[in-house]
A protein has these predicted regions:
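C-terminal capping/gating helix-and-loop segments adjacent to ligand/active sites or protein-protein/ligand interfaces
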Residues: 351-354, 370-424
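Extracytoplasmic "Venus flytrap"/periplasmic binding protein-like
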Residues: 57-131, 138, 166-169, 175, ...
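Periplasmic solute-binding protein
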Residues: 106-111, 135-172, 181, 200-226, ...
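Extracytoplasmic/periplasmic substrate-binding proteins
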Residues: 41, 55, 244-328
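A structural signal for short loop-to-beta-strand junctions that line the ligand-binding cleft
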Residues: 94-95, 125-163, 194-198, 299-300, ...
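Short, solvent-exposed loop/beta-turn-alpha elements that line the ligand-binding surface or hinge
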Residues: 119-131, 175, 196, 200-201, ...
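Short, low-complexity disordered leader/linker segments with a strong preference
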Residues: 1-37, 60, 421-428
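Glycine-centered hinge/linker elements that transmit conformational signals in sensory
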Residues: 184, 228-258
């Protein structure tokens, strides 16, 4: 298996040590709880629709349990995570909360003793056979598993409007960064209002998301992963070159000062006023929820420079230490990890299932394409969505990007130094 990859295979032997002698902390009991509170940042659009499908199943299976949806709006959880931290510090943890697989789960929560060990639940539900072995590793610390993946998202997606592209003389998706810049010039000459759609609101996470993609596209996956292993320097020539690409991309937007959230900004694609948009595949679910049609109002391709690369993230659910309605939470986790639950949730959420046995006939053409790429592409974790970075680094990255944009997107060296300082602080 190639470095950094997570394949759609079930390798039970890889997880065997974690299962052997596992904790009994997640031993199931009948759900006699009268309430259940879930905490996410899925408050609108396709995200809320996906959550709603899962909630409907839960209510049908647990009719005596009142469902409490404690969603906090804000893309990538920029608002929700702050609220969650305050609640957990005050001893008021929700019964289950959303967290990204990778360092977000492992370093931000599990290593802090905030989550229950779910290894026994994995054994009882057979998830060691139905989830990819390497994905399970992304929720595992010291042999114990701490969250349940409900999906896989792709971060490095290029979106555009076919009719707008045709008017600009663009007949195929750009595959390289140079080709993308050539097409941006075509959009500009054709009078497209915003050749490069930018989303600068919601705590700058969407601009950090764009930077994360640019780093992979410019440097390649090995150099990118080296930023977190220490083999690539944040202040070295590779990052310097990537930041020139980033700076140039921003020049095709609203001078890097767009204050729209990702949903409002992305509407420029389906309305035909925007050229290209780099955003995760939750955008497709959002647009479909708004009535747009895939293939007519928008289409997709891997981000230029990342053809054959799948920059991934995974939403998972947890069992916090001290959850008031523990049995109700266990019922939610079992549903979230089930085939029925994942195939109800993901087609509406705009993601593919984390399970290996998903029924792809329920998914649209984009998601079928994503599933095929997930099975064969070089996989690279998302920084902006918690795979390669914990909450502390993500917050620092958002702040560094916000500072860069507010300064006119001119201080590339300063941005590199801020990112290096953020990584150094995490390592310490």
């Amino acid at each position: 298996m190639r470095k950094g990859s997570i394949r759609l295979i079930a390798a039970a032997s890889v997880i065997a040590l974690a299962i052997t002698g596992c904790s009994s902390s997640s031993d199931e009991a009948a759900n006699t709880d009268t309430e259940f509170e879930i905490f996410t940042w899925w408050a609108s659009g396709g995200e809320a629709a996906g959550l709603g499908a899962l909630v409907d199943l839960y209510k049908a299976q647990n009719p005596e349990t009142e469902f409490i949806n404690a969603s906090v709006a804000g893309g990538a959880g920029v608002n929700a995570k702050a609220v969650l931290e305050s609640r957990m510090a005050a001893g008021d943890a929700p019964d289950s909360f959303q967290a990204h697989a990778g360092l977000e789960v492992i370093a931000s929560y599990a290593a802090q003793g905030k989550l229950e060990d779910l290894t026994a639940l994995y054994q009882s539900e057979g998830w060691d056979k139905s989830f990819p072995a390497d994905l399970i590793k992304q929720t595992t610390l010291d042999g114990k598993i701490y969250s349940v993946p409900v999906n896989i998202h792709r971060a490095n997606v290029l979106w555009w409007n076919p009719a707008t592209a045709a008017k600009a003389g663009i007949t195929k998706a750009p595959e390289t960064l140079d080709e993308m810049f050539a097409d941006l010039e075509k959009f500009k000459k054709a009078g497209v209002k915003t050749p490069m759609v930018l989303a600068g609101g919601e705590g700058s996470w969407a601009m950090a998301h764009l930077l994360d993609y640019v780093l992979v596209a410019s440097m390649g996956p090995e150099k990118f992963e080296g930023l977190f292993s220490g083999s690539t320097s944040w202040t070295g020539p590779e990052v310097a070159e990537a930041l020139k690409v980033y700076q140039r991309l921003l020049s095709y937007g609203d001078k890097g000062k767009n204050s729209f959230g990702w949903g409002e900004a992305g509407a420029a694609i389906t309305k035909g006023t925007g050229g290209f948009f780099i955003m995760g595949d939750w955008a497709s679910a959002q647009w479909q929820n708004e009535g747009a049609v895939l293939g007519t109002d928008y289409t997709f391709a891997p981000g230029p420079g990342t053809v054959g690369i799948y920059q991934w993230l995974s939403d998972t659910f947890t069992l916090p230490v001290g959850a008031k309605n523990r049995n109700a939470a266990l019922a939610w986790l079992k549903l979230s990890g089930s085939k029925e639950g994942q195939d109800a949730f993901n087609p509406l959420k705009g993601s593919i299932a984390a399970r290996t046995d998903s029924d792809l006939s329920l998914y649209d053409d984009y998601l079928k394409s994503a599933a095929a790429d997930w099975a064969k592409d070089r996989l690279v974790g998302s920084t902006a969505h918690g795979v390669t970075a914990d909450n502390k680094f993500m917050a620092s990255m958002n702040a560094a990007v916000g500072k860069y944009i507010s300064g006119g997107a001119k201080d590339n060296a300063g941005l590199a130094k801020d990112l290096a300082a953020a990584q150094a602080a995490v390592v310490k």
